[in-house]
Curated annotation (Swiss-Prot):
Obligatory cofactor(s): Mg(2+)
Catalyzed reaction equations: alpha-D-glucosamine 1-phosphate = D-glucosamine 6-phosphate
Pfam families on file: PGM_PMM_I, PGM_PMM_II, PGM_PMM_III, PGM_PMM_IV
Organism: Streptococcus pneumoniae (strain ATCC 700669 / Spain 23F-1)
Protein name, per record: Phosphoglucosamine mutase
InterPro entries: A-D-PHexomutase_a/b/a-I, A-D-PHexomutase_a/b/a-I/II/III, A-D-PHexomutase_a/b/a-II, A-D-PHexomutase_a/b/a-III, A-D-PHexomutase_C, A-D-PHexomutase_C_sf, A-D-PHexomutase_CS, Alpha-D-phosphohexomutase_SF
Amino acid sequence: MGKYFGTDGVRGEANLELTPELAFKLGRFGGYVLSQHETEAPKVFVGRDTRISGEMLESALVAGLLSVGIHVYKLGVLATPAVAYLVETEGASAGVMISASHNPALDNGIKFFGGDGFKLDDEKEAEIEALLDAEEDTLPRPSAEGLGILVDYPEGLRKYEGYLVSTGTPLDGMKVALDTANGAASTSARQIFADLGAQLTVIGETPDGLNINLNVGSTHPEALQEMVKESGSAIGLAFDGDSDRLIAVDENGDIVDGDKIMYIIGKYLSEKGQLAQNTIVTTVMSNLGFHKALNREGINKAVTAVGDRYVVEEMRKSGYNLGGEQSGHVILMDYNTTGDGQLSAVQLTKIMKETGKSLSELAAEVTIYPQKLVNIRVENAMKEKAMEVPAIKAIIEKMEEEMAGNGRILVRPSGTEPLLRVMAEAPTTEEVDYYVDTITDVVRAEIGID
């Protein structure tokens, strides 16, 4: 991570950390870096979610892009993966999404996609950061016909909706409950599932600029769980603020998380011979029950660090076509270059229709082990060295011996905060509590600063 770019673009509290001034510079410098090798006038797509700060930042960002001669196609409110899809399929130089995903309304972010539809690599981000930190702005300042042109492009959203519908199957009156998180999916999810023939109940579809992710969406699925039961829906589908995640709810109101969604889609593709190298890419946070279910089905797995960018890197490097995270980021590389909650939802309902199975039946094949995660505040300098402390190393080894292969312990530093994360999984909550509490007691005694 750099000075400005984190694991998912530039983020911060809007108008305080992520200011219009910074947005202008990101547009100007980012647009230049991503289009300097173009032979024709560069074209960049810009989308945003429903945050009150979105239009402010969009105006500044667009001004920066136009100032270096880039033609900007303004997409309005739509999902992050829609920007990636349109960049790749319509030959744009780049795409930019203004969103802070599942964060509250006071935050916002700016995320770039290259001309291939993928998020920027570290080298491109470093080029942009170098320009941001330069003492003087020496980039070209064209005038008159050299300036960029601004185009409103609402057709982009319709094209994305049509594409997702084309990947699904008719749902013939299936009762579907949607929670669009008062976010980006509020402009598209209803239309997509109506076009597929579903009978819909929708919540979280009245954005006011301040209520994005507020007690709704994939991080707060409780309202959707109740709605599914009340409406008798076959499935509930909860997206986050920019709709790159999906958490599902079965007909009984039970959560079906990213691990289970990946398993269901992965098994379906594997049985059809369409799962590349018969492998799913996942992260170290995926549940042990998910791993055991894959082993039972003979499906391979590749494990990465936490973060969808690392999942995508591994998929691209090794040619895999399915990967994701427990949090609901699911990447279906045959269809799009990034996590796409609405695409995952369309595929999940297609599998239900084709197999004739309920979501609870499909999800029951994965027995999720109870999991507990505790964050311990430590000095930044110590979080990377925790495993070198003899007492900590010894207690982890002792707990792993007691588990005897029927559980899992993961101790890792936070990538952004002075925290050490201690996680355990085991067959019962009592065992999980015992393992985590025993380890955290030792960690706190040795290096904790609480």
